[in-house]
Amino acid sequence: MRLNNKVALITGAARGIGLGFAQAFAAEGAKVIIADIDIARATTSAAAIGPAAKAVKLDVTDLAQIDAVVKAVDEEFGGIDILVNNAAIFDMAPINGITEESYERVFDINLKGPMFMMKAVSNVMIARARGGKIINMASQAGRRGEALVTLYCASKAAIISATQSAALALVKHGINVNAIAPGVVDGEHWEVVDAHFAKWEGLKPGEKKAAVAKSVPIGRFATPDDIKGLAVFLASADSDYILAQTYNVDGGNWMS
C-alpha cells in the first residue's frame, strides 16, 4: 500500500472530491482526518470509511481554529504527512456585478484558508523532520478567465501561484507541493452552479449542465473517481521528484 501509516489531513472532505480522496487514501493504508465545517456529515463520512478515518470540525477562514486543529492532529497522530487543501466555494458574477461580501468570502475560503493551512501544516512537517506532501486543489477556472466567474477564477489562479511559491520555499525541508486542476466535476454543487447560470444567462434548469458536459472533449463530467488516482500518486513516494506542478484532470478542456 502506497500510503501505509501516513497521516493525511483533508479539508472539505465530508463529500465530493474530498471524500473521494479520503476513501482512496484510507484504501492505500493512510490514517485520514476528514476536516469540514459540516461536522455532522464529516462524522457520517468518516464512520463509513471505518477506523482509519476521523472527523474534525474546521472552518478554514478561522485562523485560530486552523492552528488548533493542526496542533491536535499532530499531537494525536504523531505528525502530518499529507495535506490536501480541498475546501472551496463557488461564486458567479461579472466584474461589474461583484460585491465586497462575495469577494471576501471567496478569497477567505479559497485562498486565505489554503495559505494558512499550508503555513500551519508545513511547520509541523518541518518540526517532525520527515518531509511531506501538500496538494492544493486548483481548477480549470484558474487557467483562464471566464466572464461570469470572476472571483472564483481569480481565487483558483492565485492557488496555482501560491502552490509554486510554497513549493520553492518548502522543498529544502523535503516537502513537495503540487496542485490538481479539475475540470467540471459532477456532484451536489452543480445544482447551485446550474442555478447561477440560469439566472445570469436566462437558461432553463439543467440546460447549462447539459451543454457543459457536451463541450468536454471526453464527452462527460468528471467524478471524484477520475481524480483520486492522481491524488494518491501526488501523496505517495512515487511523486518525490515532482514539484510546483499543477495537473489538469479535465477531459481535455485545457491542453498543455
From Swiss-Prot:
Keyword NAD belongs to the record: yes
Induction of expression: Up-regulated by growth on D-altritol or galactitol.
Signal peptide: none
EC number: 1.1.1.16, 1.1.1.-
Annotated coiled-coil segments of the chain: none
Pathway: Carbohydrate metabolism
Disruption phenotype: Deletion mutant cannot grow on D-galactitol. Does not exhibit a growth defect when grown on D-altritol.
SUPFAM superfamilies recorded: NAD(P)-binding Rossmann-fold domains
Entry binding sites for NAD(+): R15, G16, I17, D36, D59, V60, N86, Y152, K156
A Gene Ontology molecular function term of the record: L-iditol 2-dehydrogenase (NAD+) activity
Active site, per annotation: Y152 (proton acceptor)
Top-level division of the source organism's lineage: Bacteria
Reaction(s) catalysed by this chain's protein: galactitol + NAD(+) = keto-D-tagatose + NADH + H(+); keto-D-fructose + NADH + H(+) = D-sorbitol + NAD(+)
Keywords for the protein's UniProt record, in alphabetical order: Carbohydrate metabolism, NAD, Oxidoreductase
Pfam families: adh_short_C2
Gene Ontology BP terms: galactitol metabolic process
InterPro entries per UniProt: NAD(P)-bd_dom_sf, SDR_fam
Family: Belongs to the short-chain dehydrogenases/reductases (SDR) family.
Described purpose of this protein according to its UniProt entry: Involved in galactitol catabolism. Catalyzes the oxidation of galactitol to D-tagatose. Can also catalyze the oxidation of D-sorbitol to D-fructose.
Alphabetized NCBIfam families for the sequence: PRK07067.1 (NF005472), PRK07231.1 (NF005559)
Name of the protein this chain belongs to: Galactitol 2-dehydrogenase
